[in-house]
Amino acid sequence: MPSRTALSPGVLSPTRPVPNWIARPEYVGKPAAQEGSEPWVQTPEVIEKMRVAGRIAAGALAEAGKAVAPGVTTDELDRIAHEYLVDNGAYPSTLGYKGFPKSCCTSLNEVICHGIPDSTVITDGDIVNIDVTAYIGGVHGDTNATFPAGDVADEHRLLVDRTREATMRAINTVKPGRALSVIGRVIESYANRFGYNVVRDFTGHGIGTTFHNGLVVLHYDQPAVETIMQPGMTFTIEPMINLGALDYEIWDDGWTVVTKDRKWTAQFEHTLLVTDTGVEILTCL
């Protein structure tokens, strides 16, 4: 299999329209978002709305994921996700968030996160992360997954499989009364078995009526975190796991984060609810 050349920015298509009847988050058209100090524990009413947002986000991710194949552009994946969201009455949360120009993130190969969909053509052997967030009913639902394109090298296929497994192991630790830090401990201990490195500077987050409510969910072991999980908390778990070192660079677009050594990376994400007895995944179909 020929080696993939390092990625570079493609050409952006025009901004996709959203029907006027679909409610926008407050930050659309503004340089910043009003967020970061909202309650971490949600009301039953907000939780029920988040179930709706989560299902729509999951549906958009599944539809876009089906299209991942050699020869497809990342802009086409954005079109599919965008149309699914608006057809279901949801606003694409990333569109206009701090100036982000597209309706989802598409992060290939060495892109850790926040890749912008453009004219980049997916090549046989690529791995493609799609990150979709739906805003409907005044709340957000956020999810992502990494999809293989064509014949993926064993090293990269295993990275994807193990990142998915690390994510699910972490989700299964969620329980009221348990320290939030156990999430990162489980992810990092599993990833370290294979010599992988867990990204530190980009984290999971609290989510609800705002995209990021101030709660930070680390994906690495940090016992100093004293937060205890409580029923009604909603947050994402979304580990990014690298084959190589943790050093990264950000492209001139201000968003796209790539590994400095250009080794590949994978990610999965769900929005979660801490229940009275454990966890509910809100971003499931």
UniProtKB/Swiss-Prot annotation:
Description of how activity is regulated: Inhibited by bengamide derivatives and by various metalloform-selective inhibitors.
SUPFAM superfamilies: Creatinase/aminopeptidase
GO-annotated biological processes: protein processing
Catalytic activity: Release of N-terminal amino acids, preferentially methionine, from peptides and arylamides
One cellular component term from this protein's GO annotations in UniProt: cytosol
Binding positions (a divalent metal cation 2): D142, H205, E238, E269
Protein's name according to its UniProt entry: Methionine aminopeptidase 2
Subunit structure: Monomer.
Molecular-function annotations in GO: cobalt ion binding; initiator methionyl aminopeptidase activity; iron ion binding; metalloaminopeptidase activity
Gene that encodes it: map
Entry's family note: Belongs to the peptidase M24A family. Methionine aminopeptidase type 1 subfamily.
Binding-site list for substrate: H114, H212
Residues at which a divalent metal cation 1 binds: D131, D142, E269
EC number annotated for this UniProt entry: 3.4.11.18
Entry keywords, A to Z: Aminopeptidase, Hydrolase, Metal-binding, Protease
Known function: Removes the N-terminal methionine from nascent proteins. The N-terminal methionine is often cleaved when the second residue in the primary sequence is small and uncharged (Met-Ala-, Cys, Gly, Pro, Ser, Thr, or Val). Requires deformylation of the N(alpha)-formylated initiator methionine before it can be hydrolyzed.
Cofactor descriptive note: Binds 2 divalent metal cations per subunit. Has a high-affinity and a low affinity metal-binding site. The true nature of the physiological cofactor is under debate. The enzyme is active with cobalt, zinc, manganese or divalent iron ions. Most likely, methionine aminopeptidases function as mononuclear Fe(2+)-metalloproteases under physiological conditions, and the catalytically relevant metal-binding site has been assigned to the histidine-containing high-affinity site.
Domain of life: Bacteria
Alphabetized InterPro entries for the sequence: Creatinase/aminopeptidase-like (IPR036005), Pept_M24 (IPR000994), Pept_M24_MAP (IPR001714), Pept_M24A_MAP1 (IPR002467)
CDD domains: MetAP1
Cofactor: Co(2+); Zn(2+); Mn(2+); Fe(2+)
Thermal dependence of function as given in the entry: Optimum temperature is 37 degrees Celsius. It lost all its activities at 55 degrees Celsius.
PANTHER family, per the entry: METHIONINE AMINOPEPTIDASE (PTHR43330), METHIONINE AMINOPEPTIDASE 2 (PTHR43330:SF16)
